[in-house]
Amino acid sequence: MSFETVEYSLNNAIATVTMNRPDALNALSLQLTKDLDAAFRRAIADGARAVVFTGNGRAFCSGGDLREMQSMWEKEGRIEAFLEDPLGALHGVIRVMRETPLPFIAAVNGVCAGAGVNFALACDIVIAADDASFREAFVRIGLTPDCGGTFFLPRVVGEKIATELFMTGDAVSAQRAVEIGMINKAVPAASLLDEATQLATKLAAGPTGSIGRIKRMMNASFSNDLTEQLALEHECQIESGKSTDFKEGVAAFFEKRPPNFTGS
């Protein structure tokens, strides 16, 4: 299966999904949205153990495709033509990213704006090129954030900084994004994909069942109270304790050798 606007590869159980509309700064057209959904689902079906998500060209993703939006607006005579079904499709992709147990690593190159920022934040770990920039740009064209921005950003930078970034639409450098906890780290642009792939390789070699359960617990931690979270931790620990990987991990510890985890 090939995709019109996405490049997909699977190597050593690592799926690399690359947005491929460089001339449009990887703006999220309806076709790109459909291709991302299909590519992420293919990674799951292919048995990938980690996903690297990036963009071709000088942008990770510049946000929604304003040209397509304007065209649909003019054709249908109402902006809802773009903001209903296509926006719902975008939100569906976000849910796939968050609900699959696979770890997602964003490798953010260059421009990252609007919905592109929120797609990056939907990943479990975000690595950026040191020349990348992040901008919650919605307000600059009179829109409000979507694609989970008001869910993800306050959780990583706090309410006040998130509110400022949403209301001003100001750009944030990669270095500043690290300082405020928006992303995990910034690396030289030339080594961005290597850094992301190395981390994906490390995660893919780990006990991916446990990693998936960690993701599930982290997703739930902001809505659960302490009692509920302790109960979920108990449930996940029991599941992990029954796994083959736990037995392998303990055996490797006592035998003083690296574990050979299989995800089972």
Would you name each region that the model predicts?
Residues 31, 35, 89, 96, ...:
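Charged catalytic carboxylate motif
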Residues 1-56:
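Conserved CoA-thioester-binding segment of acyl-CoA-metabolizing enzymes
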Residues 17, 21, 36, 53, ...:
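Terminal peptide-recognition signature
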Residues 215-224:
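Short, charged, surface-exposed hinge/linker loops at domain edges
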Residues 6, 95-209, 238, 242-243, ...:
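Crotonase-fold acyl-CoA enzyme core
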Residues 55-96, 112, 225:
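Glycine- (often His-adjacent) and acidic-residue-rich active-site loop
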